[in-house]
């Protein structure tokens, strides 16, 4: 099988995996990765706080797709071809040792994203893939059966037989796709924290509780509920449970200018009557103790003092003087603590958007465009997003791998060595 000139626009996880899969499937393909920035795989580097949440330990495609607020249905078949188990096997076959943490997240044993980056760069280099940084694509047009790609500060356009667009959430990537006939679902942020304008809460920054049950309530929308850990920050609330809610509610939150109500059940293992009973028992059995310093529940002391203060219980008040009204208010706060969401905060570690190329315009058997022959897609440029970084990286690995196979299929064009040097250098 003769090779083709393959241009991969985007040097992130999806672009690299697509390029590697393509070059592996047909070693004669002349594959070039064009990265607009100064460094390759920059988002992989910051994933998981610099440790790189490679994937998630979920090997059943039917369960895996439930972690994708958008794109799960389209990914169902894709995950039957390349899923987290395949990702783990791929990296381990190349000497990268991985570990699975208690919450299912998979990291390199080194706890260093550089391990993953080095593996990908070394594999690409070994396969002869050309890696170009500071190669921002300004224009892409199709002339006959070829793509002419204009790169910044390069006088002549690059020519490719096939193109993989793996530009992540870059607006330029969306523009290129639209110019070639694709519909772009307007992108909005996903995976972000909630700004809560409550100085008393913010004073308790760093406090975390697990598990809680959190419910997001928005106007004219069904409530969304998630269970997991929550974290108090300098600007409000974060943690896995908040990030999951931000992902599932991304579009509705954007439409409502990131205003809504978050209701937190701090004791999901107890019913409201059980909480009331525990408080009443304290009033009976420890009447002389100060309420603020004696918490009958497995909660951080600083959280307990937040709620006793919030419902108007003085710091020195003893259990003997707890009124029925105060008891009911405190129980309600622990069972249904309510916070007004005043906006969204940043979550720079895993900044993700929902939106992108409409999925109905992509053939997920090959990741080929249904609008422009020879064009392929992978990664976050598509209208796909997961609830945490590991799920987003897995969709990048999966769509990149399938796109690489698709790019390599039917490679019948011939390219001379001289021509390849002229057009792809």
Regions found by a protein language model. Name each.
Residues 7-9, 34, 137, 156-169, ...:
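Short hydrophobic core segments
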Residues 162, 166-180, 384-412:
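A conserved FAD-binding loop/helix module that cradles the flavin
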Residues 4-33, 403-408:
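N-terminal Rossmann-like FAD-binding beta1-loop-alpha1 element of flavoenzymes
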Residues 133-146:
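A conserved short coil-to-beta-strand element within the FAD-binding core of flavoproteins
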Residues 23-49:
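Glycine-rich FAD pyrophosphate-binding loop
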